[in-house]
Amino acid sequence: MKRKIIVGSRRSKLALTQSNWVIKKLKENYPEIDFEIKEIVTKGDRILDVTLSKVGGKGLFVSEVEQALSDEVIDFAVHSMKDVPSSLKDGLVIGAIPKRESPLDCFVFNEVSTLDDLPKGAVIGTSSLRRAAQLLKHRPDFVVKPIRGNIDTRLQKLHAENFDAIILAKAGLARMGWLENTSLKLEDISPELCLPAVGQGALAIECRETDLQICDMLASIHHEETGICVEAERVFLKKLNGGCEIPIAGFATKTGDSVHFKGLVGNADGSIILESERTGASPAEIGNQVAEELLSEGADTIIKELRNI
C-alpha cells in the first residue's frame, strides 16, 4: 500500500468537509497512511448563473474529478451520491458507500416556522425540479424560484432575496453543523410530501477498478445496508435514464431481508406525478420493476417532453 493517498474533491466547503470525514474514517483503520486532498473545480461549480436543469447533461459535479481519477492524478474521489450519474466512466467503480446521513429534504423558513403557516403565494427557493414538482403538487399556489450557491450562500439569500422559505438537503446541513444553529427555523419534509433524490444523504467513494489495494481499503468503511438501498435507487435511475433536468425521485429502505423502494417521475409543475413502489429481496429487481411500471404509465413521454423543452 502506498504511504500517501491523493483524494479528489470538489472545492466547496461541503465537499471538503465530506472528504475530510472519509479520511478520518479511513485513518481509524489505516493510521500509517497519509492522505492529501486535491481540490478540483467542476463544470457545475463554474456555472452559477443558470439552473442545472437548463445546463442539462450528466455528471456536472463529477466529470472532471472522474477524469483526474482515470488519469491517475488522484487515487480515489469523494462525491455526494446524488451527483453521480447512473453509469460510471469506464474503468471506475464505487469502492465504498459509507453509512447514509438523513435522506430527507428540509425547509428553512424566513419568518414562519412550519409549512402550514406559509401564506398563499409564498415564494420558495429551490433549483431542484424534483423538489419543485412535488411541492407544487401539494401547494400549487406557491411561487418557486431558482436559487444556486453553496449552503452558506443560499442561507444568506433566504433573507437578502426575500424568500419565504428555501429547501435544502438535511444531510448537507448536518455535515456543516447547521442543525445545531438555533437561529434557523427548520422543518423536515417527509418522504410522503417530497420523495428524496436517488442517493440523497449518501456518499460515493469512487476508485479505479484495477487498483485493488485502494478498493480493499475503501471496503473497510462500506455500509452494507446503505449500499443495498442505494443499489435499488440507482438501478431505477439508470432504467429511466434520469438526470437533473427531470423531476425523478427514488428512495429505498431495508427491513430485515426485504427492501422497500418507491419511485416517482413528474412534470415540472407537479400537475402530473407518477408513483410506484415495491418490496422484495433483490434491490436491483425492485428498482427495475418500479421503473418498468412508471414507464408503462407514461413516464417515458414525460421524460421526452422535458428533454425537448
Swiss-Prot record:
GO terms for cellular component: cytoplasm. Belongs to the HMBS family. It comes from the Bacteria. One of its GO terms (biological process) is protoporphyrinogen IX biosynthetic process. PANTHER family: PORPHOBILINOGEN DEAMINASE. The porphobilinogen subunits are added to the dipyrromethane group. Its cofactor is dipyrromethane. NCBIfam families: hemC. The modification S-(dipyrrolylmethanemethyl)cysteine is found at C244. This is Porphobilinogen deaminase.
